[in-house]
């Protein structure tokens, strides 16, 4: 099976609307991301509905807690059968290691475990506001290195950091990049953005794209256009 690069961010507050959108696209063309709002509103059964339709799911809940609590949440995600789950790297090495170790019994069926470095909406002034006197890129490198040393599969990072992280941490370390906007799209609330082709060329492995697809008149066509552009690289 082709390793789909595009992860469509489902940001709906109505389950019927979300499923109506999902039914317009092909599981062979993308994966789906379910975040905090949808999971809180609709719960695990919504993820199961997506699985029934043949989609792989990135459960984007950014767990951040004491090691025992965080690892049990990660295990619950594995039991749900998701393809990818994430934790905040700022939770530290013990938390991330516990989360990785609890997945070992699942073998090849375990989800990818990804660390969250610096949220793409954050600028240097935001980091200063929480007591971190560092540039976003410096903090990303620090947390990504900690994530790799903890044995996780990769990190969420902006496309601007992808090239640097690939060079620093190796080709096998997966980079999941939000803030992706096909050419001509509005910037939205992501501060550090890039086009799909640019992001893959920079070293990103998976691209999270939301409104440019979910709000398109013909989302299947937009997906095809993006995938075609990536295939022609």
UniProtKB/Swiss-Prot annotation:
The catalytic activity of this protein is classed by the Enzyme Commission as 4.1.1.23
Which residues bind substrate per the record? 11, 33, 60-69, 120, 181, 190, 210-211
- Root EC class: lyase
Which keywords annotate this record?
Decarboxylase, Lyase, Pyrimidine biosynthesis
Q: Which SUPFAM superfamilies match?
A: Ribulose-phoshate binding barrel
- PROSITE patterns of this UniProt entry? OMPDECASE (PS00156)
Q: Which Pfam families match?
A: OMPdecase (PF00215)
Pathway where this protein functions: Pyrimidine metabolism; UMP biosynthesis via de novo pathway; UMP from orotate: step 2/2
| Gene3D superfamilies linked to this entry | Aldolase class I
Which GO molecular-function terms appear in the entry?
orotidine-5'-phosphate decarboxylase activity
The active-site annotation reads 62 (proton donor)
Question: What does this chain do?
Answer: Catalyzes the decarboxylation of orotidine 5'-monophosphate (OMP) to uridine 5'-monophosphate (UMP).
Q: What protein family is recorded? A: Belongs to the OMP decarboxylase family. Type 1 subfamily.
Q: How does it assemble?
A: Homodimer.
What's the name of the protein? Orotidine 5'-phosphate decarboxylase
Ranked from the top, the taxonomy reads:
Bacteria, Pseudomonadati, Pseudomonadota, Gammaproteobacteria, Vibrionales
Gene assigned in the entry: pyrF
């Amino acid at each position: 099976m082709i390793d789909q690069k595009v992860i469509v961010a489902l940001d709906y507050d109505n389950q019927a609307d979300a499923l109506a959108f999902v039914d317009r696209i092909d599981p062979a063309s993308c994966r789906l991301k379910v975040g905090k709002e949808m999971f809180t509103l609709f719960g695990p059964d919504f993820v199961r509905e997506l699985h029934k339709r043949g989609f792989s799911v990135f459960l984007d809940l950014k767990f951040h807690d004491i090691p025992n609590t965080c690892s049990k949440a990660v295990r619950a995600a594995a039991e749900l059968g998701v393809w990818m789950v994430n934790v905040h790297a700022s939770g530290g090495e013990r938390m991330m290691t516990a989360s990785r170790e609890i997945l070992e019994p699942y073998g090849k069926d375990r989800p990818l475990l990804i660390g969250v470095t610096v949220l793409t909406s954050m600028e240097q002034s935001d980091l200063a506001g929480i007591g971190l006197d560092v540039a976003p890129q410096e903090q990303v490198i620090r947390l990504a290195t900690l994530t790799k040393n903890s044995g996780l599969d990769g990190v969420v990072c902006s496309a601007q950091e992808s090239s640097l992280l690939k060079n620093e941490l190796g080709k096998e370390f997966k980079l999941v990049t939000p803030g992706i906007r096909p050419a001509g799209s509005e910037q939205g609330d992501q501060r550090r953005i890039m086009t799909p082709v640019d992001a893959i060329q920079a070293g990103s492995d998976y691209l999270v794209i939301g409104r440019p697809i979910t709000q398109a008149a013909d989302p299947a066509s937009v997906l095809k256009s993006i995938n075609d552009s990536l295939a022609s690289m």
